[in-house]
Amino acid sequence: MYSLFRPLLFTCDAERAHDISLRTLDIAYHSGALPLLTRHTRPLPTTAFGLNFPNPVGLAAGLDKNGTHIDALFALGFGFIEIGTTTPRPQAGNPKPRLFRLTQQQAVINRMGFNNLGVDALVRNVAGARRRNGPLGINIGKNKDTPNEQASNDYRYCLERVYALADYVTINLSSPNTAGLRALQEEQTLRRLIGELRETQETLAAKHGRHVPMLIKMAPDLSDSDIDAAARVLNEMSVDGVIATNTTVTRPLLRQHPLASEAGGLSGAPLLGQSTLVLRRLRTHLPETIDLIGVGGICCGADAGAKMAAGASLVQCYTGLIFKGPQLVGECVEAIRRRLEASSSGRENTQ
């Protein structure tokens, strides 16, 4: 069905198409037509960060920034949904145009800039969501005008506001579209920031009587030495999990494309190799007690399998949905299922 809808959608500019897609999704969900338009996703129970997931394929942050489409998105078959990024105060983001579709390359360049209605609006929306078919992650960031020296105040404020409603919280330190944000991944800065957030997490756990996992979302553009340094900090601070990765400011395989010079983060198929290398290196340098989510460039089931092979416990997709539609979710689940079955069969044959 999506293959019939996509050509019409792609006649619109990318951001308008994004808005139309979400409105159409809501209409289909509330009218009861959504099951007729999507394939049933078979369960593949998975455990990570101490949470139970109906399947290991989730939606990455960025599609539903304000938590206004949670019910409809879960109905697409995702094992978990991550909403945001949200910030303490509302902000408009960067000037338009700020979202560019590279159709032939199955890629997107965005410089949205954390446009959102603020964490208080998101909290109200989450509280009003009726269906939770799997864990809900909430991705938090800092406001554009908050200096890095005060970034922990923004993150702690958001963490306190969302803690009671989130199944896990992602600390977004890696968007390339907020000036200076990625500097927070520098080893000493990262150690100080995560230390403060871990203290807040422990205080909130005691207050609410439950531990909400805290994940760190990393950039794909780090050098090997920077990845290793970050891994040391993440291990020392005993974070619950890591998401690898965010979008890239490099332009792999796109040098001749007319949009390659547009500022912003690149996602989609060209990011697959780079993000998977970072994932694999993090897996090598982190203990198995720290689960990883693989994201970046997943456009088919084989891509999801590659993330799992590189050490991911879960995967997320977003840009691939733009080009493949909701069927990508089930395709990824089945690819991961086949990989697990083949691995299990191989172990049995060697015993």
Curated annotation (Swiss-Prot):
Keyword check for Membrane: yes
Disulfide bonds: none
SUPFAM superfamilies linked to this entry: FMN-linked oxidoreductases
Enzyme class at the top of the EC tree: oxidoreductase
Substrates-to-products reaction catalysed: (S)-dihydroorotate + a quinone = orotate + a quinol
Binding of FMN, residues: A61, G62, L63, D64, K65, T85, N139, N172, K217, T245, G268, G297, Y318, T319
Keyword Cell membrane listed: yes
Active site: S175 (nucleophile)
EC number(s) stated in the UniProt entry for this protein: 1.3.5.2
Pfam family, one: DHO_dh
Key words, A-Z: Cell membrane, Flavoprotein, FMN, Membrane, Oxidoreductase, Pyrimidine biosynthesis
Entry's localization field: Cell membrane
PROSITE patterns per UniProt: DHODEHASE_1
Domain of life: Bacteria
Bilayer disposition of the protein: Peripheral membrane protein
Residues holding substrate: K65, N110, R111, M112, G113, F114, N172, N177, N246, T247
GO BP term, example: 'de novo' pyrimidine nucleobase biosynthetic process
TM region(s), chain numbering: none
GO CC terms: cytoplasm; plasma membrane
InterPro entries: Aldolase_TIM, DHO_dehydrogenase, Dihydroorotate_DH_1_2, Dihydroorotate_DH_2, Dihydroorotate_DH_cat, Dihydroorotate_DH_CS
Cofactor: record remark: Binds 1 FMN per subunit.
Cofactor needs: FMN
Molecular function, one GO term: dihydroorotate dehydrogenase (quinone) activity
Subunit structure, as described in the record: Monomer.
Family to which this protein belongs: Belongs to the dihydroorotate dehydrogenase family. Type 2 subfamily.
Name listed for the protein in its UniProt record: Dihydroorotate dehydrogenase (quinone)
Taxonomic placement: Bacteria, Pseudomonadati, Pseudomonadota, Gammaproteobacteria, Lysobacterales
